[in-house]
């Protein structure tokens, strides 16, 4: 819990340290996997490298564990929740390509054949990630010469 509190309070260095201490105690468990995710999120916020390797170690450990009996439990990490964590880490780190790949996977895996969203909060955040990526992709196109018109608070074509 110390790592999670530090992470949510913006104390990222302390979150990394707490996650590493917790991982030393919670070896080969879902808690260990969740602490890897928290460490990765904190390191992404700090701009540190090595996130893909760290996430791969969490995925490998998760794959060795049996599927949780109650995946809806916040503290039980399952493969779908792990992909959501990975999406979040890559989004924070600015790796839009991987973030969008994970977001698409999470939406697919959390939507039933009849269209019911199994994890609405997760799906919503993934949609925000995809929308943000699309917005950036559109804004960065070479033909987009629109510049903010501060006088009118809108976009206008550049005349220069």
Model region roles, listed by residue range:
Residues 1-160:
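Conserved binding/catalytic microenvironments
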């Amino acid at each position: 819990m110390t790592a999670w509190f530090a992470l949510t309070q913006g104390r990222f260095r302390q979150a990394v340290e707490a996650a590493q201490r917790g991982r030393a105690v919670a070896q080969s468990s879902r808690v260990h996997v969740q602490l890897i995710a928290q460490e990765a999120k904190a390191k992404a916020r700090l701009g540190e490298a090595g996130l893909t390797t760290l996430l791969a170690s969490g995925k490998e450990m998760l794959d060795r564990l049996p599927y949780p009996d109650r995946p809806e439990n916040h503290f039980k990490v399952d493969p779908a929740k792990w992909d959501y964590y990975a999406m979040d880490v890559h989004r924070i780190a600015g790796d839009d390509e991987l973030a969008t790949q994970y977001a698409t996977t999470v939406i697919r895996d959390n939507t039933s054949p009849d269209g019911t969203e199994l994890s609405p909060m997760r799906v919503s955040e993934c949609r925000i990630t995809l929308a943000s990526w699309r917005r950036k992709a559109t804004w960065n196109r070479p033909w987009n010469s629109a510049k903010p018109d501060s006088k009118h608070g809108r976009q206008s074509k550049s005349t220069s």
